[in-house]
A protein has these predicted regions:
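Extracellular glycan-recognition regions
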Residues: 2-217
Length: 217
């Protein structure tokens, strides 16, 4: 994949918000197709792609499409995408935080029971899914943010916003303080023609405080 001409990472000590080049990431599973369009990345998902481990359903899916890059300790990752194409059951787009096949988090939007939901699946051996309906977010440009931190550095704070709203808290969850990667995610468990347009992937300074919203840009 060709790059979009922007830099990837910098040391946390001097980090400012910076875009990540699409070419800096590696796919957990190659999608059905990708193309660059004016600096945005359009991803076509493969039918049946998903991430889930065991809980309730009994099955394990480890074949979603995550574009992963370095995620430094004490840093945040932000992924922005257009939600207009999420129209079929279980269509998903957002961010994947990955420390291994049994320790990962996916956070973003998913269409469930005909309604768009904002949520997160936190997996430590088995998956734990939390979600809330956001029907008014349909068709908007969405940013999902995940910030590493906590007293021991072993937690992640997930927030989300639309292009016209402030940050909304989604989840605070345990997450390894060790090596991990993160980046855009798309899954299409039920169809083979989902395309999602990602407009930005960025690294930013970590949240200063759990109860203080990060900057909007």
């Amino acid at each position: 994949m060709e790059g979009n001409g922007v830099s990837s990472t910098a040391s946390v000590e001097r980090m400012t918000r910076q875009r990540v080049d699409w070419a800096a990431g590696r796919w957990t599973r190659e999608p059905a197709g990708t193309r660059l369009d004016g600096g945005t990345l359009v991803v076509a998902a493969s039918e049946g792609s998903d991430y889930w481990r065991t809980t309730h359903y009994g099955f394990v899916h480890d074949d979603g499409h995550g574009l992963l890059g370095e995620w430094p300790a004490d840093a945040a990752v932000e992924v922005t995408f257009e939600s207009s194409s999420l129209t079929a059951l279980y269509d998903q787009a957002g961010v994947l935080l990955y420390a291994g096949p049994e320790q990962w988090v996916k956070a973003g939007l998913e269409l469930s029971d005909g309604v768009l939901h904002l949520g997160a699946v936190v997996t430590n051996g088995v998956s734990d899914w939390s979600m809330a309906p956001v029907p008014d977010w349909a068709g908007q440009r969405i940013t999902i943010r995940a910030s590493r931190g906590g007293v021991a550095g072993d937690a992640v704070t997930i927030r989300a916003r639309t292009e016209t709203s402030g940050w909304r808290s989604v989840r605070v969850a345990p997450f390894t303080a060790g090596a991990a990667s993160a980046g855009p995610l798309v899954c299409a468990p039920m169809r083979g023609d989902l395309e999602v347009r990602f407009t930005e992937w960025a690294l930013a300074p970590a949240d200063r405080d759990l109860h203080e919203d990060p900057p909007l840009d």
